Amino acid sequence: MSIVNSIRAQIPPVHPEGYPFIGGFALVTLLFFWLWSPLGWIALVLTIWCALFFRNPVRVTPVRDDLVVSPADGRISMVTPVVPPAELGLGDKPLLRISIFMSVFNCHVNRAPVGGRIEKIVYTPGKFINAELDKASEDNERNAMVISTPSGQIGVVQIAGLIARRIVSFVRVGQTLATGERFGLIRFGSRLDVFLPEGSKALVSVGQTAIAGETVLADFRQGDGGRTYRAD
């Protein structure tokens, strides 16, 4: 393998959602270089950052019924039982919620935490307060999805934040997702909440780093037998 191919293999592809933003940054960079080169170098750094933000890397997902993987890259910010948002239709009893906060430096492509059928998608307009705050789950703009699995229904909520002002969904009601399949993204910093069925136990802790499609958040089955992996 040539050096060029080796370098290329280490650079993740960019998601098409990022093309307009990267193109805009690139044009501004050229303009700034023409006006004053120091500004051009600053703009070039921002262009590279934008490309990294929209990176769309291949992930190796553990595949087995009853596994729940992280839907987002980021930091586990909350692991606590709370009453799920009404729009999910998951009842009024507290369910285990695992929240993943994505900074502007994380990959923001979101992946299905479980394989199953999408029963519901509900978009709710709202505010843009700090996504790390607990009340952001009620006050902020969000897109909620319910996935039906043999182990029960899983709620997934994309929550916009201070900088994130655009939630993008690639899926529709009735569609069947595979574990780790890409289903959307949130631009420029945000949060993902996963609501697990009653009786679930988390396998992650607050402060832990999560990798979308790879980090196992919960396992409804005792033991670890029968797990396989899929790259996507």
From Swiss-Prot:
GO terms for cellular component: plasma membrane. Its cofactor is pyruvate. The record marks G189, S190 as: Cleavage (non-hydrolytic). It is a peripheral membrane protein. Heterodimer of a large membrane-associated beta subunit and a small pyruvoyl-containing alpha subunit. GO terms for biological process: phosphatidylethanolamine biosynthetic process. Binds 1 pyruvoyl group covalently per subunit. Belongs to the phosphatidylserine decarboxylase family. PSD-A subfamily. One of its GO terms (molecular function) is phosphatidylserine decarboxylase activity. The modification Pyruvic acid (Ser) is found at S190. Catalyzes the formation of phosphatidylethanolamine (PtdEtn) from phosphatidylserine (PtdSer). This is Phosphatidylserine decarboxylase proenzyme.
